[in-house]
Amino acid sequence: MNNDFNSWDKYCNYLWFDKQVNIWLDISKINFTLDQISSLENKFKKVFSALKELEAGAISNIDEKRQVGHYWLRNPSVAPSNLIKDAINNEIRDISEFGEKILEGKITNNKNQKFTNVLWIGIGGSGLGPLLITEALQENSCGLNFSYIDNIDPFLISEKLDELSDKLATTLFVVVSKSGGTPEPKIAMNIIKKHVENKNLDWNSNAIAITMKDSQLYKKAQLENWLKIFNLPDWVGGRTSITSSVGLLPLALINRDVSEFIKGAAIMDDLTRIPNIKDNPAALLSSAWFFSGDGIGKRDMVVLPYRDRLQVFSKYLQQLVMESLGKKFNRKGEIVHQGISVFGNKGSTDQHAYVQQLRDGIDNFFCVFIELLDTPNSNFYFDSENPKEFLSGFLQGTRSALSNENRQSITITLDKLSCLTLGALIALFERAVSFYAELVDINAYDQPGVEAGKKAAAEIIDYQKQVTEIFNNGEELSIKEITSLLRNSSAEPIFFIIRQMCFGNDDYLINGDWSKPSTIRIKKIS
């Protein structure tokens, strides 16, 4: 490593720890010097100032002209108005009380049966956040059993409904959509609702909406008298919604401490308000990202949690980091193509997979190791073999092997996985994302690429409807002929539509060779 410290001195100088959350952060295996850290001090003055403005209620999502307030959720006292503060406190209290009543059987289905299961319908952060909560924190036989619909793959929907076939009557159906108009959860909800009603079961008394007030979903849930509606404010984005009702309701329904989760995030938020790089964990973490990628994101982030319960954390960070930081333009309107690609799974599994390339292949990444110090109540041994010690040995061995090849890494250590430490860990990465965005002068809170993808998908869906109507005329047509009948279309997406619609479908007569799309002619015969 090119730095002006020897390894031990650098480790001691830059190891961060806080006893409120018992989390350590080590960035010593990132290639930087003291002078480089010092060179960021002026930038960080602007970073700290920008975050203060954001928390005070500045319009930070310029595209949607809205505030960004997920930090208020864990400390309502910093919210810019008493109205918001009271709404947050009331929502937290409502969720906790609702969860208790569900688990105690004080709230039941329309046949007075206790709820046993949850089918959670949500995409992106609306699905990943709850999945992380339940995978990381649910204990055996505690609370309700969760299943997730985070896609409109028909096989996934069929599989989940089959799994719940004899439990549908006692399943809570939670639909999460801020606008209520996002196609995937809306389509999944309609399919599942129809399936439930076809079984002569009552959807409305089992259904919960998490949405923005007066959204399409809000109005539907209110009109149909659903069991419950929880608020998802317009100032909370999907990828930062885990400390809103989106993450707190799952906590309550698996009988975990909602207040401890919020407390962990609030403590970390406070720690990351310290206006000093070395004393601020988010400043250290974002600096490490900045130095490892030369400020232009030239290295990917490989997340390796050494605990199976945190396997989903890699996917969670993938959305949080990539959707926030993957931007074509900076705030000046200059093309910068910023971003950090994130992938990962878990240790020590990945030591038998892609760690080979990380050590000996292209040097285009930095690792984030996540270590835990606790053990189960029942210690598992075989002779003198302790799995915890082996897992720790694998982590340290991989970290050392990478370091010996000048491959960079960050190590985060938690004393245990709890509501408090998970809340703090999530908040640490949220704050680091905000800090990094300020360092490179991009907006972390818009997502023009996602919106462009949604718009393009909507156009294709419209073409699908038009193609279906064209075939109703009974003519035999080629791909080019179909394309010519559609405004502003091109042949390739039309071929994709035709293949999806017609291949293996006896309602259509296909002449031609599927390997030669220009020869294909299609006619609807029934």
Curated annotation (Swiss-Prot):
Q: What is this protein called?
A: Glucose-6-phosphate isomerase
One GO CC annotation, please?
Answer: cytosol
Known Pfam families for this protein? PGI
HAMAP family the record matches: G6P_isomerase
Which organism encodes this protein? Prochlorococcus marinus subsp. pastoris (strain CCMP1986 / NIES-2087 / MED4)
Major localisation: cytoplasm
Q: Which domain of life is it from?
A: Bacteria
Q: Where is the active site?
A: E323, H352, K454
Q: Where in the cell is it found?
A: Cytoplasm
* Gene name for this UniProt entry: pgi
